[in-house]
Regions:
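A solvent-exposed, acidic/Ser-Thr-rich amphipathic alpha-helical stretch
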Residues: 17-19, 25-73
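A short, structure-level motif marking secondary-structure boundaries and short turns
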Residues: 1-2, 83
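Short acidic-aromatic low-complexity motifs
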Residues: 2-27
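A beta-strand edge to alpha-helix "cap/lid" segment located at domain peripheries
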Residues: 49-132
């Protein structure tokens, strides 16, 4: 069974507003830092519909893959880290986010997110010779 952090990350990757909001408790204490901005919300729908799926990954951002996902615990607080492959304006990016959270039951009640921003995806370098 997936924990709340993994469900959150997978819902972000799927751009599924209903599933994303369902990971969070009513009255969530949500704060996040992205390059250039601090975000706050107390409603699961505000986090899902406005912050994550409108501003961070709006209609022009196509999430093409979940490149990494780890979960853990730090002194009783839960942790999830995930890396998304995103195409925006014809360019490929990686977006990594780290989140620490607490739960009430199976829903996130407190969450802090730190985002690396849209970072250019590495371009594979073609081999120039075959090594034997």
């Amino acid at each position: 069974m997936m924990n709340a952090g993994e469900r959150f990350a997978r819902a972000v990757a799927a751009k599924d507003a209903v599933a994303l909001a369902a990971t969070m408790a009513d009255g969530i204490d949500f704060q996040a830092l992205t390059p250039g901005r601090h975000w706050q919300a107390v409603s699961p729908r505000e986090v899902a519909d406005e912050i994550v799926l409108r501003f961070w990954f709006g209609p022009g951002a196509d999430i093409t893959g979940l490149a990494g996902l780890t979960t853990g615990e730090v002194g009783g607080r839960q942790h999830v880290a995930y890396r998304l492959q995103v195409t925006r304006d014809g360019r490929e990016y990686l977006v990594e986010q780290q989140a620490y959270y607490d739960t009430e039951g199976d829903q996130i009640s407190w969450m802090r997110v730190l985002c690396a921003g849209y970072r250019p995806a590495p371009v594979p370098v073609p081999a120039v010779a075959t090594v034997r």
